[in-house]
Amino acid sequence: MPTAAAAATASLRVSNIPPSAVAAELLAFFDSAVAVAGGAFACEIAAAHRGWLSRGHGTVQFGSAAAAAAAAGLASSGRLPRFLGALLSVSPSPVDLLPRASDLSLRAAGAGLVVGDRVAERVFEAADAWDGVRAEVIPGKRRVDLYLEHDSQRYKLEVLFEDMKDCLGCTLDGMGAILLQLNYAPRIHTAISGPAVNSRFMDDRFHACKEDAKFSWVRALDFTPNYSFGRCSTLVLKLGKSALVSDILKSLPFSGNLGELTMNSMDGVGASSNVVPLVHCPRDYSVPYEVLFRLNSLMHMGKIVAKHVNADLFKALQELPVDVSRRIFEKMHKLESTCYGPLQFIQQEAYSMKRSHNVLLSNEGEGEGERKLMKCYRVNITPSKIFCFGPEEEVTNYVVKHHSAYASDFVRVTFVDEDWSKLSSNAISARIEQGFFSKPFKTGLYYRILSILKKGFSIGPKNFEFLAFSASQLRGNSVWMFASNASLNAGGIRRWMGHFENIRSVSKCAARMGQLFSSSRQTFEVLRWDVEVIPDIEITTDGSKYIFSDGIGKISLRFAKRVAHHVGLDPTNLPSAFQIRYGGYKGVIAIDPMSSIDLSLRPSMKKFESESRMLNITSWSKSQPCYVNREIISLLSTLGIRDEIFVAMQQDEMRETEEMLTNKEVALSVLGKLGGSETKTAVKMLLQGYEPSSEPYLSMILKAHQENRLTDIRTRCKIHVPKGRVLIGCLDETGVLEYGQVYIRITKNSKEQKDSNQSYFYNDDGKTATVVGKVAITKNPCLHPGDIRVLEAIYDPDLVGMVDCLVFPQRGERPHPNECSGGDLDGDLYFITWDDKLIPEKVDTPMDYTATRPRIMDHVVTLEEIQKHFVDYMINDSLGAISTAHLIHADRSPLKARSPECLQLATLHSMAVDFAKTGAPAEMPRTLRPREYPDFMERWEKPMYISNGVLGKLYRSAMGHMEKSGDSGALSSSSAQPSPTYDPDLEVPGSDEFLQAAEEYYELYEEKLTTLMNYYRAELEDEILTGNIRNKMLYLKRDNKRYFEMKDRIVAAVDALHREARGWLLSSRKEEDASRMASAWYRVTYHPDRRRGKRFWSFPWIACDNLLAIKASSQLRRRRQKDDDSTAVVQMDCSA
């Protein structure tokens, strides 16, 4: 829900305007009619494009909200004069024609602006300054606009309220001023004018404005000679009048009054590069790269100021071990305000650590699990700044793993907007010219990104240059870069990856280069003679060639067992298929029990030539829970599934979510659908006999998942389908399946194992069963009604070994995977349900997903062409906009997803998906762009309508259920520390001697977990354990993809910490002492005599298996004692 009501605008909608009227006349009419300060400011009359005729209505913007209210008052009271003989009708307008402060007291002309750094509490160093600045505070848009001139060019700076770290009133040389300490640089725009520029307020009969508005604002780079906006983080706005300062501060997120501010000029030379701010180690000193990188990160996060990063600081750091510097920096990251004395802080912390032996514990247990995790350095580059992050835990990829000796020379670079949100295409390439042959205007951001890709950038001694990008990185505007050295350079890595010279399509060549950067686990090198190439299964229908075996091969049973054991799977419970990367091959390999060859690969799996023989596993077949989402619900509704069915499913889901806090069986059922190590611990605790609300750690985890689940239901319509799965697609190698048939054998969940009334299961062995009957199948994303296929699931004994995968036939006019959103068998996951209520009686003809042929070059693709393709993708990436528009048109049209608009958008979406490989962009026409957004999208900043479709009904049903339950999306109980009940069953004899060590380990764990919480901005323990951050940063709220990527990093970091802690448990101790240490961990965390304030309940449960073994032993001992007592009573009765 919106946090506050939107501020009133200064505009009115005006109707009944005479057809002959021009905007200048209407503007003058209202300006004379309204005798309030500000008068009328701008006017626009709506016009039909054909014939350029007036539509008889328009918008008038006034100089202030008070003037607009006066005009509305005149109209409502009948005192507004007639305009050209017509009686005008007015109503409030939700938006202004031009963004301006609606209150005159929130405008300041002739102000001064200074950019620089706050180097002490009341000391400011100025880097650049301007006079004659106009400031406008716009509370409705929660931002401040600053207008200024520099070298005769007009600029506008936008500062969002959310970007302000501190907003302080102060005085400067006796004048009133406002100090804004920012987390990010302001968004910079420049004015572009000219005869061909398409300004909203050109000289024509339907537009008029009192000020010069015949120009367009486009995004620009830092225009100062020394990149002051990039290097610095503080603005000072000099206003003069104390009354004006007071009025403006009332509308800003005011932090307090600073008093008199001392201003000095900034010393030192300007930046040598436009990638700022970065500090470098002086020549006379030397610190490890990790220390320098973390030091830059502290500066970028506003914890220290560049001025204080001097030779004395580097001298102090040079004398410290890396792990000590790391821990000190982690403590600095926890500071809520800027540290103006970093040298003193470092010296004091180093002295404290020297006296404590805890520092010796910090590395114990590290290294475990290194096979699948790596330390990754990340960088965000914005239009003005650079931000350093990490190193962070991530699942490794083959390229970095193979070159692990140079792991710190790799960096993942993401190009983002100033506040880390996704850069809009209009920020990179703006359409400002009018005319049929007009070309987009490439802004400075386009050339900045291209320049960094071509020339690279430096951090300390490392000069990073472009390497490659994976498909997911391309979608996230991210690339890998590498710092070349005497032994290895980026070109050498690309040559090692494979031979790409024969790929003459720029987009395909770029995609193939990124293939080995997928997160994967390395297994074995498979030699040439252990690999065979088998033919693809193809058919040509109506001139189109289809490959039924597109992306799938085979693996022998013997070799599959070796692979499964290597990646930590149970060889007695083998997955039926693995998703792989092998040299230039990618796709899926399914187990063939009859094969004696390790790998049988097909030509459709081969993407390029490579000398690499390492088999990399990216995933494997598994039983995954099935959920409907907005897209699937929209299509099923189009195909005739009634709204009441979805509402009933949602209510069942929410009822189960409520009961998970009180019902053990329900809690186990819900956790069974989730992943993550913390759910495994919770499941073990429930199975051991703990009640959901009886134990603080267990209760905390359950409440966190309950809250996240309710949020998903409300915001994403994510509803569980019990009679369904999400499975990887495979091929029927036996040829027994006919067109229209599939084979589905699944691993049954605990609920299915207990339910004997399941007519849709056949050949049920208790653990697995084959689904038989009608099934509905699709693949996300799905926009066309024909993406939903209804097929017949059958049983065949020849396929009984294929478990937890969807087996498609190799017969027919067209492959079924291709009918589902243009899917294939190289790892695509498919939604399957055998719930009769969700299976349509009739389906639509599937869409033709034949991709556009990529443009073929007459030369070997160059690195420059790949880099340009990356930036062009940023400009043309329209997937999100198309998906959103499709949902809205389907919601509003009686034809739903069959409407012409939706069908056109489905075609565009297919083109947009293929753009990464074809290079052919999908441009959405303006006529398809939504003007209003439904309530279920919660886009409060946009014009909104109440949805009457199924998604609107589900949204309001969820909101009503939450309000009835006293929950509006954030469970208040989650923020409170649970009331712990100490469990004496977890005490063991001999644990007393471990209490002192346990206390020290707890303090170390607390320090490390708090560091992670601070780094990822998690306020509570359950947030960092589950990765479900409640108060997400604004850019994460807007970008689900990047939020889920961050969530993966959080989970990886917590898993790494828990592995390290398990190392503490076992380090230098006998195995039998582990139980006593685990008991001591529990006692120092839970015992009333040892609890001091806030506790991290997760600490002892890192040793979950040890504690539950103690619990089981205590329960068994108590039962035996009870049996002995009962026997004694019986014997006494008999003797009596």
Swiss-Prot record:
Enzymatic reactions: RNA(n) + a ribonucleoside 5'-triphosphate = RNA(n+1) + diphosphate
Species per Swiss-Prot/TrEMBL record: Oryza sativa subsp. japonica
A GO molecular-function descriptor: RNA binding
Residue segments, region Disordered: 965-989
Alphabetical keyword list: Nucleotidyltransferase, RNA-binding, RNA-directed RNA polymerase, RNA-mediated gene silencing, Transferase
Top EC category: transferase
Enzyme Commission number(s): 2.7.7.48
TM region(s), chain numbering: none
Low complexity: bias regions: 967-980
Disulfide bonds: none
Function: Probably involved in the RNA silencing pathway and required for the generation of small interfering RNAs (siRNAs).
Keyword Nucleotidyltransferase belongs to the record: yes
Protein name, as recorded: Probable RNA-dependent RNA polymerase 2
Protein family: Belongs to the RdRP family.
GO biological process, one term: siRNA processing
GO cellular component, one term: nuclear RNA-directed RNA polymerase complex
